[in-house]
Amino acid sequence: YCRASYIYVAGENEEDILAKAEEAIESYVSVRGYTPKVLAIKGVGILAVGDNAKNASEIAEAFVNALNTALESESAGGLQPMPQSQIDSVDGGEAKEYQLKVNASTGYGRAENKVFIVTGAAQGFGEGFARCLVKQGANVVVADLNETTGMQTAANLNSICTTNRVIFFKTDVTDIACLSELVKTTVCEFGGVDVFVSNAGVAIAGDLTQMLPEKFEFVTKINYNAFFYCAKVVTPVMKLQNKYDEELFGDIIQINSKSGLEGSKANFAYAGSKFGGLGLVQSFALELAPYRVKVNAICPGNFLDGPLWSDPVKGLYVQYLNAGKVPGAKIVEDVREYYLSKVPMHKGCTPEDVTKGVIYLMEQTGETGQALPITGGQVMLK
């Protein structure tokens, strides 16, 4: 898995390490004809280079096992170097062919080998969205405050992975230090971040007479402030990645709402936070375009079959019924039918719908600062 030799790099600072690593890799490739599988960097750690996340994880494990074996051999007479014929068998022949076959890419998804961070992905729409990404071959970091559910979600998603992987990181999106650790952990696990999806959000309905200031501030902190925090912590990584690959783009995507495109009666806290989010999207897009970091938003319609709407206690059907948002509505089903009637396609939005939009935004390289509506025609661009 690790091939016959690795690269060791020692430098005075980050710039020195990067320069020496680049020089060492070029020399390694020119001599051996292939890229190194392991880079050992003094004071930093071991970097495993694989064709996909599963392969890289196996390389790292194999190399650490080899180091442990070498250490243990000191008590049994020391290391015994392999003859050249055995070394050659590591870099070629049947062993190499078997490894290539085992680690072959499936080529089954449009997001294959991409690294996604998705906040609010432990349950509900976020979980469904993360599941769709995994099926498209993505490596996904489930970032959520709910540790028990989040870890179970990661385990469930890993069960359908092939060459990709899923990890969980307990995340409070209102804590910028926590978000910094999220990005750091992602880089350590997967080597970088391709797409950061700011999905975590809350909706608390109520008119001016009902809405309490503390609830308004709570909605604003999660839906608006947190997007700024997310963009701030992931931007340095994306800039650095793109600096060394002129064909690489990074993506920051906010899952916004149709309520970010038009006002929402008795729902101003939510709509206001989403309108503000689009202002951040456009402003960040202007700032980051020179670094090939695209910033866009998805504005979904209503997830009428998801828990955000259908929860019997805190769901939006119940909230809107109690707030009198739907004229003449007497039961929850009246609220549901009212919202279905507003959609020309007569369907609620789904995680599959949003996933297609996110992958489109990731693949294209000609747009930034855009708000892509996925509303079944309920909101049409003017």
Predicted regions and their residues:
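C-terminal substrate-recognition "lid" of short-chain dehydrogenase/reductases
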Residues: 347-374, 379
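Alpha-helical segment proximal to the catalytic Tyr-Lys
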Residues: 236, 286-287
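Active-site loop immediately N-terminal to the catalytic Tyr-X3-Lys motif
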Residues: 209, 262-268, 290, 346
